[in-house]
Structure formats: C-alpha cells, structure tokens
C-alpha cells in the first residue's frame, strides 16, 4: 500500500491518558470495533509514512465520543505523549459493508453541495465533525464555511457516484 487512497483515517491521537501509556483517540469512524478489538493498526504523522502498531485494548469513555487505547510497546506517559497528533489508520480494504442508504462519512468529503438535484453547486463538503449528530463542513462558493447537520431532513439525497448531495436547509442555516 503506497498512496493515501489505500488508507482510511479512523481517528486522531489527541492526548495521553494516565501514566501507563494509554492514549485518547478522537474517532472519525462510526465503527467502534476499530478502537476496541485488538489487532494491527497503523499510525501516520502529518507528512510521514504509515507504520504498523498493535492495538492491545480499547474502550470508549463513558458519556463521551473519545476512546482510550493501549498499543504494544507504549508503556509510559512519555511514550504516549510522543504519539499525540498522529492519525490512526486502517487499510481502505477494511471498510465494513453498508446497507442501502448508509454512507461512509469520509466518502462525503469533496462532494458538491446543491439545493436542487439539477441545480448548480453552492459549495463543497470539506470536512466532517462527529458529535451528537454528524456535521458536514461545507465551504460555500462565496468562501464562507457552514456546518450542516447530516440528517435526512436536511440532506435528503446523496449521489456518491455523481459527486453531489442535495441540501434542504431550514431558513437561515446557510447564513450562520
């Protein structure tokens, strides 16, 4: 695996947890097993190459979206802090299959945002935030960025193969 297209970023290491080498991960994946099931994962620094690391244990923090993980060979706080800021990766071939109407959120990044199926683009999806509801960050053609809840009432149509999604925002949402 050589290119970025061969990898999925499933989370970011955001902080050391305790003194035994555990780390907190901010997930960008809706599949908790990526953080809880032992096995091989990969870490990547901003401009570095992915390198393998063994996930030993993982758990979700109660009431939070963060996970706490333990990697092989990371046995103290200093070793954990050295990894903060890196991305956690899995091979793109590890994508779980989805039911009709479900999407891998990362596939939405780059899509045109439209108000009508046959209409012009009003912007592009540039990022996503996982919170209580997933939020799409859309950069409007005017240059402003807005956060749009990824719920069916506001994003009723997604055409991955055609490269766009349709928005039906409530009044004022795109003006915030």
Swiss-Prot record:
Pfam family, one: PRC_RimM
Subcellular location: Cytoplasm
Keywords, alphabetical: Chaperone, Cytoplasm, Ribosome biogenesis, rRNA processing
GO cellular component, one term: cytoplasm
Keyword hit for rRNA processing: yes
GO molecular function (one): ribosome binding
GO biological process: ribosomal small subunit biogenesis; rRNA processing
Limits of the PRC barrel domain: 100-173
InterPro entries: PRC_barrel-like_sf (IPR011033), PRC_RimM (IPR056792), RimM (IPR011961), RimM_N (IPR002676), RimM_N_sf (IPR036976), Transl_B-barrel_sf (IPR009000)
Chief location bin: cytoplasm
SUPFAM superfamilies documented for this protein: PRC-barrel domain (SSF50346), Translation proteins (SSF50447)
Biological role stated in the UniProt entry: An accessory protein needed during the final step in the assembly of 30S ribosomal subunit, possibly for assembly of the head region. Essential for efficient processing of 16S rRNA. May be needed both before and after RbfA during the maturation of 16S rRNA. It has affinity for free ribosomal 30S subunits but not for 70S ribosomes.
Subunit record text: Binds ribosomal protein uS19.
Entry's family note: Belongs to the RimM family.
Domain notes: The PRC barrel domain binds ribosomal protein uS19.
Name used for this protein in its record: Ribosome maturation factor RimM
Classification of source organism: Bacteria, Bacillati, Cyanobacteriota, Cyanophyceae, Synechococcales
